Amino acid sequence: MADLDQVLAEIRRGTDEILLESDLLEKLKKGRPLRIKLGADPTAPDIHLGHTVILNKLRLFQELGHEVIFLIGDFTGMVGDPSGKNSTRPPLTREQVLANAETYKEQVYKILDPAKTRIEFNSSWLEPLGAAGMIRLASQQTVARMMERDDFKKRYASGQSIAIHEFMYPLLQGYDSVALKADVELGGTDQKFNLLMGRELQKAEGQKPQAVIMMPLLEGLDGVKKMSKSAHNYIGVSEPANEMFGKIMSISDELMWRYFELLSFRPLAEIEQFKQDIANGANPRDTKISLAKEIIARFHDAAAAESAHQAFIDRFQKGAIPDDIPEVELAAGEGLAIANLLKDADLVGSTSDALRMIKQGAVKMDGEKIDDSRMTLSAGTVAVFQVGKRKFAKVTLV
């Protein structure tokens, strides 16, 4: 039982909730390889560190000898998951979904062992259902049950539309578990309703209900919103090592511990020792460097991690301007306002962001801080602009 206790401790690490843990324990006690399912709708081409929280747990099950299925929702991706959304998602075309699916496979193999990963597409069983099968599936749940979802409840209360096909999404995801005869399904906390639907449909089909393991949603670089491309607070697993290093070093010291908990493979005792060292006066920056190097070595290699560390020292700690900054040519017209220049050069997301950064003293032109938010630049200007510690661009106005 000691070994089983250790396995459970590894599985529990970083999880938000396991439903039901007694079911999971019963399955593990049987000693056979379990069928572990993780589904992902390829709605965007890039996988970021937020996605890897669950993928890391899936990798653990591979290492424990279980059968791992990475399910690509090529069918459900065209429906659109309503989880956490305050409006109906625009549907993707089959071509978009399949193109994104190809990049998903390449990226997940940075984490999962390809030889131990079974890839499935849910169109294999959802398309053959046809109209009769879909109606039969829909008959297994009620509108009242669907309206128990917080996101649907809020949208209904605020007068936002809810499309009928959105009610189908949890049923389709749940049916995936029936088709695969899943023993365990992994998902984020925002997927709870969908994950539990799998248990209900499996019971209805006479199967043993899957255990559900929910992982927390990783906060993005801002430490507030969940990591996502739309929030511009993400680190993509395919980003260059130098870019990844700089982004990780930009997170707050408090958020660093959250990243250690959900992204690091270090023993918990070692992470606790880091905390103790900082309490005793160690510099949190050095601990953050250890985190950055660990993550970069995983998605690139150890040499890339060391190189990125050195580049970070040269660029930020010694104040050097990087050699590979983008060069941008902009039309000056009768004069280009500094806020518009920074936005057009992709150094900020909006002119209001530019004004805020200038006010904070975070904008430089050729190394000199810009204090005048109303500055206008004319044609012929050639200068290196810097926003914060990491963003540079050489701008030529014509």
Curated annotation (Swiss-Prot):
Pfam families: SYY_C-terminal, tRNA-synt_1b. Its main location: cytoplasm. The keyword Membrane does not apply. One of its GO terms (molecular function) is RNA binding. GO terms for cellular component: cytosol. Residues 336-397 form the S4 RNA-binding domain. A motif ('HIGH' region) lies at residues 42-51. Its EC number is 6.1.1.1. One of its GO terms (biological process) is tRNA aminoacylation. Keywords: Aminoacyl-tRNA synthetase, ATP-binding, Cytoplasm, Ligase, Nucleotide-binding, Protein biosynthesis, RNA-binding. Gene3D superfamilies: HUPs, RNA-binding S4 domain, Tyrosyl-Transfer RNA Synthetase. A motif ('KMSKS' region) lies at residues 226-230. ATP binds at residue 229. The keyword ATP-binding applies. Signal peptide: none annotated. InterPro entries: aa-tRNA-synth_I_CS, aa-tRNA-synth_Ic, Rossmann-like_a/b/a_fold, S4_RNA-bd_sf, SYY-like_C, Tyr-tRNA-ligase, Tyr-tRNA-ligase_bac-type, Tyr-tRNA-ligase_bac_2. It catalyses: tRNA(Tyr) + L-tyrosine + ATP = L-tyrosyl-tRNA(Tyr) + AMP + diphosphate + H(+). It is found in: Cytoplasm. Catalyzes the attachment of tyrosine to tRNA(Tyr) in a two-step reaction: tyrosine is first activated by ATP to form Tyr-AMP and then transferred to the acceptor end of tRNA(Tyr). Homodimer. Belongs to the class-I aminoacyl-tRNA synthetase family. TyrS type 2 subfamily. This is Tyrosine--tRNA ligase. It comes from Shewanella oneidensis (strain ATCC 700550 / JCM 31522 / CIP 106686 / LMG 19005 / NCIMB 14063 / MR-1).
